């Protein structure tokens, strides 16, 4: 590394970024998320050799929301062939809001990528077809990757999302009309919202996602999570489509593959080195953590890290 890592470096970055708190807005279209304290700020790093660094609210759990879309894709990759997955969902950035219907209509019900809502719903539809208990399987995967046995779903958040699910239901039904959604819409929506309602901390997320920095291998599991090629493909998708319609801006400022969620979390990958998880609940206009991006920008500048 260009800079020797320690917790003090991370604490200093949080101090630099904290004045941004108050400039974003906590997600309020999901009532259960609107009550989250917007002043929270945390970061954790897990290296490929198992070292852990953290600062701020790194051990407080929060709703990971769309970060879970990476995990559902990983599970799908373990149960479906490459051809089966990518004939139903694309690999390109959308340039549109994550819950857009217009682009989906124009492109005959094939979502642009698995990290927008439509694409994640197709992936969940696929999991419903191959898994007897999709929600339990996701918990097993996350608990195994993180090494933490009590990670679970926030059922209050999942219920709140389901009660305000008109747009996601419309997306699912639109895809069903094009023949790209095969199972009961309500059942798949429930699975999808539970995945989004996973509660994890920055520390747990960094440990969970370090396999993407380690050619598909988790640091404490013998069996590879995905192949080295699949890890590279997932990182590529995160780089092009992980930050909603602001992937280009994020690439310019931070330069790492990443996936965000409207709970305020972001996971970023430094291939061959580390996974980084940040959390700040206040979002920018694209639905990404405003202070979280600033933390990652400062960190990559100090470390001299970018994939570009």
Swiss-Prot record:
Coiled coil: none annotated. Keywords: Hydrolase. GO terms for molecular function: glutaminase activity; protein homodimerization activity. Substrate binds at residues 66, 117, 161, 168, 192, 244, 262. Transmembrane segments: none annotated. It catalyses: L-glutamine + H2O = L-glutamate + NH4(+). Its EC number is 3.5.1.2. InterPro entries: Beta-lactam/transpept-like (IPR012338), Glutaminase (IPR015868). GO terms for biological process: glutamate biosynthetic process; glutamine catabolic process; negative regulation of growth. PANTHER family: GLUTAMINASE. Belongs to the glutaminase family. NCBIfam families: Gln_ase, PRK00971.1-1, PRK00971.1-2. Homotetramer. This is Glutaminase 2.
């Amino acid at each position: 590394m260009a800079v020797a890592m320690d917790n003090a470096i991370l604490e200093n970055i949080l101090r630099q970024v904290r004045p941004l708190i108050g400039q974003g807005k906590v997600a309020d279209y999901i009532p259960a998320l609107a009550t989250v304290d917007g002043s929270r700020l945390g970061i954790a790093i897990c290296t490929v050799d198992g070292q852990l660094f953290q600062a701020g609210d790194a051990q407080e759990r929060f709703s990971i929301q769309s970060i879970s879309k990476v995990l559902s894709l990983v599970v799908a990759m373990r149960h479906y062939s490459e051809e089966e997955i990518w004939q139903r969902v694309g690999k390109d950035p959308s340039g549109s809001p994550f819950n857009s219907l217009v682009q989906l209509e124009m492109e005959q019900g094939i979502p642009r990528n698995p990290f927008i809502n439509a694409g994640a719903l197709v992936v969940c539809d696929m999991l419903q077809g191959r898994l007897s208990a999709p929600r339990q399987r996701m918990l097993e995967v996350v608990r195994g990757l993180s090494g933490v046995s009590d990670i679970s779903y926030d059922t209050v958040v999942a219920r709140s999302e389901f009660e305000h699910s008109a747009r996601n239901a419309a997306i699912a039904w639109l895809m069903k009309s094009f023949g790209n959604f095969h199972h009961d819409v309500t059942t798949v929506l429930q699975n999808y919202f539970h995945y989004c309602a996973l509660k994890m901390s920055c520390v747990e997320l960094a440990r969970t996602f370090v396999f993407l920095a380690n050619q598909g291998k988790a640091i404490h599991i013998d069996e590879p999570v995905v192949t080295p090629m699949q890890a590279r493909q997932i990182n590529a998708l995160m780089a092009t489509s992980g930050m909603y319609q602001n992937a280009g801006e994020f690439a310019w400022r931070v330069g790492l593959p990443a996936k965000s969620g409207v709970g305020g979390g972001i996971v970023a990958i430094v291939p061959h080195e580390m996974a980084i998880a940040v959390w700040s609940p206040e979002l920018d206009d694209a639905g990404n953590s405003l202070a979280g991006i600033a933390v990652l920008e400062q960190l990559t500048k100090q470390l001299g890290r970018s994939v570009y």
